[in-house]
């Protein structure tokens, strides 16, 4: 079994969720490194993808020295630099965007909307969902604010997102923020959706075999 090196800390709740789910599934050895969230968000906001990719590559190098043989980032927004990172990473990457795109296609969804940070929603997941129609809702700011409320543990944000989901003319909503897995699951979600975190976790477990 391959050893996973996970870059976490963006945010911490989602990182803990990744750890819990991987442990519950009986994953092999896991190495975790905590990224500087302020630096990452500043770089994403400035579209400084080359510098951000270099930062992540250095973190992955440290994970590799610790014994990791495959790597991943436990957050969606930092994947803004994933194409640049793929060119310089010292370890194979399992990236959440490609895993999510494959899941959307497998389910036959043609038109989707995204829930997540403003960066992710407005950029249509950084334009990387090839061949999939991604609409940008008029409520981008409301989605961002509701998402941040869910990160803070509030229930109002979840209710707002559920209401917006029912109003959107799409086949499904992509939960494109890892913290959303902390508030949405199959028991409380009554709209068609793709949970990118759970999709990513399945891809990670497959890559570790």
Which role does the model predict for each range below?
Residues 1-209:
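Non-catalytic structural scaffold of enzyme domains
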């Amino acid at each position: 079994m391959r050893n996973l090196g996970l870059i976490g800390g963006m945010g911490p709740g989602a990182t803990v969720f990744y750890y819990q789910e991987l442990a519950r599934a009986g994953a092999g050895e896991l190495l975790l490194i905590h990224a500087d969230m302020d630096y990452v968000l500043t770089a994403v906001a400035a579209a400084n993808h080359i510098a951000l990719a270099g930062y992540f590559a250095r973190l992955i190098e440290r994970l590799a020295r610790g014994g990791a043989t495959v790597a991943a980032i436990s957050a969606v927004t930092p994947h803004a630099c994933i194409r640049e990172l793929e060119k310089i990473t010292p370890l194979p990457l399992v990236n959440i965007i490609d895993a999510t795109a494959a899941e959307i296609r497998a389910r036959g969804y043609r038109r989707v909307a995204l829930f997540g940070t403003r960066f992710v929603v407005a950029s249509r997941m950084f334009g990387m969902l090839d061949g999939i129609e991604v609409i940008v809702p008029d409520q981008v700011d409301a989605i961002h604010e509701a998402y941040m409320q869910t990160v803070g543990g509030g229930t109002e944000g979840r209710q707002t997102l559920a209401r917006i989901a029912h109003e959107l003319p799409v086949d499904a909503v992509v939960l494109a923020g890892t913290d959303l897995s902390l508030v949405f699951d199959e028991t409380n979600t009554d709209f068609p959706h793709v949970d990118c975190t759970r999709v990513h976790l399945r891809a990670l477990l497959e890559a570790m075999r």
